[in-house]
Structure formats: structure tokens, C-alpha cells
């Protein structure tokens, strides 16, 4: 599949109808006060990466971002981890995602929480970020590589917008040559939009893109426990 067709395919997969309305309807059914919605009220739907807000908080501690920083969230979805990152560190945060439906929902949820002064979102491809070189103090990306076929271009583009000496935090799913992948999975209905690398190849791609790896934590066991507990 060509890059443009692949992007269109992924965009369609992540563009559900009236997502914001469905979230509001769900909150109402749970008896939430829609005039006083909190980050934790939204957590079940807006932090749907593996281990949810528990993982987000671990990554926030690892990142050590500070209030004077401007952080880019690449593949932000509807912005849950972007908002939590900003709320808990005080940093400015900008999220980008390919899905304009996700971005519209992210902006509306951010306004609902009155966080729009510190958090903003833009629809774009991670392969062509609309920012100047050395623009962000830090980069944050949670489980988006699985849909990216050209990982080197994505990582190079992410590195390009990061200031020299800036820190990037990636929380990603990698493949295992000895374990076949059975579809559907959370990020793909079939193999046409799933592109997993082994941990070894992912590290090679990161280094080739210009990153220096300081910390590498394998959370496979915790992820497996999270899936087992969800059954």
C-alpha cells in the first residue's frame, strides 16, 4: 500500500462519527456533572493506551518536564495524556494527530476542562509536522508507532522539531518474532495497517533518527497483566 493510501486508511479507522457527543452521552449516563467534568472523569475514554493513567503518571515522572517547557505530543488521540501531562507538570502542551475527528474532540474536551490556555491540538501527519526546527523543549508519544510504516521518517521528523538537548519520551508497542499477532488488535483490524518492529530494530531506528537512548524500560509483563485483568 502506498504511503498516501495508508494514511487515508488509518485516518478512516480513527474517525468515528460524533465522538464528542458519544463521550458526553456516556458521562451523562454515569451521572457526571457536565459543568464540572474532571480529568479522572474522562480517563476511561481518553487515556486508552495500555495501563491508562497509571502508565501516564509513570512516564510523567520519568520525563521530568517542567512548567517553563513546551512539549509536543505526537499521536495524541483525543488528548487525555496531553492534558494530564500539562495539568501535573504545568507545561504547555501541543498535541498532533492524523485524525481530524480526534483533534476536534480533543479541543472540545480541553475547553470543557477549561485547559485551552495551556493545551492545544492540531490535525497533521507525524511525517510532516508543521513546526520549525528545534521548536519544542520536549517530545511525548504514547503508542502510535504501530500504525507508522515509515518509522525512520517519523522519528527523524520528531527529532527535527526537538531542541538540542531536549528529552523525548516514547511509550510504544514492539513486535516479537516468536509470537504471531492475531487480529483484530486495538490499533488495527488486520495486517494492512499494523507495522511492528522488534525492540532491537526499534532502537536501531531511534538511533538512526538522531536520538540517544538514555533509558529503556521493558513493561511487557505489566502490559500482559493489564490485559489479563481486563478480561
Which role does the model predict for each range below?
Residues 70-128:
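Class I SAM-dependent methyltransferase SAM/SAH-binding core
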Residues 137-150:
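A short SAM/SAH-binding and catalytic strip from SAM-dependent methyltransferases
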Residues 191-231:
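Substrate-binding/catalytic lobe of Class I Rossmann-like enzymes that use SAM or dcSAM, i.e.
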Amino acid at each position: 500500500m502506498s504511503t498516501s493510501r495508508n494514511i487515508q486508511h488509518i485516518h478512516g479507522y480513527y474517525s468515528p462519527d460524533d465522538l464528542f457527543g458519544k463521550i458526553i452521552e456516556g458521562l451523562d449516563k454515569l451521572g457526571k456533572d457536565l459543568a464540572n467534568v474532571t480529568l479522572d472523569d474522562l480517563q476511561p475514554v481518553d487515556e486508552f493506551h495500555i495501563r491508562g493513567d497509571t502508565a501516564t503518571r509513570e512516564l510523567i515522572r520519568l520525563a521530568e518536564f517542567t512548567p517553563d517547557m513546551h512539549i509536543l505530543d505526537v499521536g495524541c488521540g483525543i488528548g487525555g495524556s496531553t492534558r494530564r501531562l500539562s495539568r501535573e507538570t504545568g507545561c504547555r502542551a501541543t498535541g498532533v494527530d492524523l485524525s481530524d475527528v480526534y483533534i476536534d474532540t480533543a479541543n472540545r474536551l480541553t475547553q470543557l476542562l477549561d485547559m485551552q490556555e495551556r493545551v492545544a491540538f492540531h490535525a497533521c501527519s507525524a511525517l510532516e509536522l508543521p513546526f520549525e526546527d528545534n521548536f519544542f523543549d520536549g517530545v511525548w508519544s504514547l503508542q502510535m508507532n504501530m500504525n507508522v510504516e515509515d518509522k525512520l521518517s517519523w522519528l527523524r521528523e520528531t527529532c527535527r522539531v526537538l531542541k538540542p538537548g531536549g528529552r523525548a519520551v516514547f511509550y510504544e508497542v514492539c513486535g516479537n518474532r516468536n509470537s504471531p499477532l492475531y487480529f483484530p488488535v486495538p490499533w488495527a483490524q488486520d495486517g494492512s495497517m499494523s507495522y511492528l518492529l522488534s525492540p532491537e530494530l526499534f532502537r536501531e531506528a531511534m538511533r538512526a533518527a538522531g536520538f540517544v537512548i538514555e533509558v529503556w524500560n521493558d513493561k511487557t509483563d505489566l502490559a500482559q497483566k493489564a490485559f489479563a485483568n481486563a478480561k
